[in-house]
Regions:
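N-terminal helical capping/dimerization or prosegment-like subdomains
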Residues: 1-84, 257-261, 278
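Metal-dependent amide/peptide-bond hydrolase catalytic core
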Residues: 3, 50, 186-389
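A structural signal for isolated positions on well-ordered beta-strands in alpha/beta enzyme cores
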Residues: 45, 73, 134-136, 300
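Active-site metal-coordination/substrate-binding segment of hydrolases
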Residues: 69-134
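Acidic-glycine-rich active-site phosphate/pyrophosphate-binding loop
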Residues: 83-98, 162, 177-189, 351
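Short, conserved micro-motifs enriched in small and acidic residues
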Residues: 102-114, 142, 203-206, 367-374
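Acidic/histidine-rich catalytic neighborhood of metal-dependent amide-processing enzymes
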Residues: 110-184, 388-389
């Protein structure tokens, strides 16, 4: 079989060697990306998080005439999920090649994609581009598409107005046009502790947490049975789940605190803001009832993470461009979420297309097949031709 270029393999190895687990800083990797870009004459801009421990990186390879507006975004996230508790056959932060596969944390999701881009920088620079190529690398995708929000805002602020975007999440180089939104919430009920033999002197926070969780399950059932639905998804309806509940300190103590974590993933036709408001209103009613019983009680409703879904029309130019670059056409929609919806919501029609199989992402002994890297290289080569004058 054809092997990936030595440039791609070298860049992928360098990226994997940097542990960018979401809980930690990604700045060493941003330093590396920045240096690689500077080495070929490309300026970039960092967009930091609030405490400057992490950063996005945005760079533009201008068209041959110097234009920076329009063109295409190549987007990828720099963080990876933890390896804690996983049984790996080799060091997860050192690339190992076995059986025509590369093993290591992030090989599939999604440092191989970024590595291919870095390996192709000389070709990007030497091409006589008729349209610019924008490189957008984010932080904290794995914990809720956090960094991409300010990254997309920066693209809008610079008035780059890209005509389309490719998000290189592992799709086996299939052109994915749709996925659901992602919405994660934490609802905290604060009651009053008391001895369990004197319940009237306390206010049971778990009781209110359970009532709230039951309401969420009722809505989940409603969405599952009444729709709307989209048969392109394995799970054709909007899904909603209570996934974590914490509360109480002892069996003989009325619990003063209970926290309910829930999430929903909605179809594009569902108004996610209206759905959130409906649930929040019920939580607020419970909070008012608690305060009426005891003024010390309270309720807080917090959205922890969220990103819009993706539903790119097949007639969009970016879909045709993906096909011309060798992406495999796909009519199904994927269950996982990506940053693609943020780019699309900002006016850039977006396709998810990258090397690797999502089934290998996040797993112990994460890997990517070498032929997937080769396919991604071919995609980039054809993209250069398509965008050249």
């Amino acid at each position: 079989m054809t092997r990936p270029s030595s440039a791609s393999l070298r860049e992928i190895s360098d990226l994997i060697a940097l542990d960018t687990t979401s809980r930690d800083t990604n700045l060493p990797l941003i330093d590396l990306l920045e240096a690689k870009l500077q080495a070929v004459g490309i300026d970039s801009k960092r967009i930091y998080n609030e405490d400057r421990s992490k950063a996005n990186l945005l760079a533009t390879i201008p068209a041959d005439d110097g234009s920076r507006r329009g063109g295409v975004v190549l987007s990828g996230h720099t963080d990876v999920v933890p390896v804690d508790g996983q049984n790996w056959s080799s060091d997860p932060f050192t690339v190992h090649e076995r059986d025509e596969k590369l093993y290591g944390r992030g090989t599939c999701d999604m440092k191989s994609y970024i590595g291919v881009i870095l390996g192709k920088l000389p070709e990007f620079i030497s091409a006589k581009l008729s349209q610019p190529i924008h490189l957008a690398f984010s932080y904290d995708e794995e914990i809720g598409c956090v960094g991409a929000v300010s990254l997309v805002d920066e693209i809008v602020s610079q008035e780059l107005a890209p005509r389309g975007c490719f998000v290189g999440e592992p799709s086996s180089m299939r052109a994915i046009r749709g996925h659901k939104s992602m919405n994660v919430f934490k609802v905290s009920f604060h009651g009053v502790a008391a001895h369990s033999s004197l319940p009237s002197e306390g206010l049971n926070a778990i009781s209110y947490g359970l009532r709230f969780a039951s309401f969420v399950e009722e809505i989940a059932h409603e969405l599952r049975t009444e729709g709307p639905s989209d048969p392109a998804f394995i799970e054709p309806t909007t899904t909603m789940n209570v996934n974590l509940i914490n509360g109480g300190i002892a069996v003989n103590t009325i619990p003063s605190d209970c926290t309910v974590h829930f999430e929903f993933r909605s179809l594009a036709v569902v108004d996610r803001e209206a759905l959130t408001t409906r649930i929040k209103n019920f939580a607020s009613q419970l909070g008012e009832e608690m305060r009426a019983r005891n003024p010390q009680a309270s309720m807080t409703f917090e959205q922890v993470a969220g990103a819009p879904g993706l539903d790119t029309d097949p007639s969009e130019e970016i879909v045709d461009l993906a096909a011309r670059c060798g992406a495999i056409a796909a009519d199904d929609k994927v269950t996982y979420g990506t940053e693609a919806g943020l780019f699309a919501a900002a006016g850039s029609p977006t396709v998810v297309c990258g090397p690797g199989d999502i089934a290998q992402a996040h797993a112990p002994d994460e890997f990517i097949e070498l032929e997937q890297i080769v396919a991604c290289e071919g995609f980039m080569d054809q993209l250069i031709k398509e965008l050249s004058s």
